[in-house]
Design a protein with these regions (language model features):
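Elongated, amphipathic alpha-helical interaction scaffolds
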Residues: 1-196, 200
Length: 201
């Protein structure tokens, strides 16, 4: 039995063995042991945890299960294929980085992409590479069909102003005056924030 002092370092041994196994084609290969996946700490934009077996009625949350990963793009940013795989990877990492094996079942994961521009190129790649299709559920809400993890796409400007007032107004083209005043008044009614008019001389 190995003690802590003489514990075998398996990963360096594997790396060496792998390179030896592939030495005949080594001129074509580059090996990067313990390659860092990101220059900065990886983080999920928003993680929404739902009580088990609770069905969310709100339109943007009907797809939700117990653990819901959300990727948000600002009005000036666009969603691309690398964003898709990054967020998908985060979901898999979140599932695996738990205390016990399968503590978070894959069946309890969902992924939501929220953006302002319909990602035509990304969806074309997913259709071609992964044979995924897209289904328009209602204004601004789309389901990506064909993966074991439920995935939805939310296009903020296309959301219903009645059903999704807050998200629909989360944009940088609010018209000065009426729209901004109405947005502030609605915030005040919900007591989410308290805004007072500046004192005029």
């Amino acid at each position: 039995m190995n003690t802590n002092d003489d514990k075998i370092q398996w990963h360096p041994a594997f790396d060496a063995a792998l390179q030896i196994e592939l030495e005949d084609e080594a001129e074509y290969l580059e090996f990067e042991p313990e390659h860092l996946l990101s220059k900065k700490p990886m983080q999920i934009d928003v993680l929404v945890k739902n009580e088990k077996d609770v069905k969310i009625k709100k339109n943007i949350g009907r797809i939700f299960r117990q653990y819901n990963i959300i990727e948000y793009k600002s009005p000036d940013d666009k969603l691309n294929i690398d964003d898709f795989y990054k967020t998908y990877g985060y979901a898999c990492l979140y599932k695996s980085e738990t205390g016990d094996v399968d503590q978070i079942p894959a069946t309890e994961l969902t992924i939501t992409f929220v953006c302002y521009h319909y990602p035509v190129k990304m969806l074309q790649r997913l259709e071609y590479d992964k044979k995924m299709s897209i289904k328009n559920i209602e204004n601004g809400i789309y389901y990506l069909i064909g993966d074991s993890i439920p995935i939805q796409l939310i296009i903020i400007p296309k959301l219903s102003k009645e059903n999704n007032y807050w998200l629909n107004n989360l944009r940088n083209d609010l018209k000065s005056g009426g729209e901004i005043r109405n947005f502030i008044e609605q915030y005040g009614k919900l007591s989410l924030i308290h805004i007072s008019e500046p004192t005029r001389p």
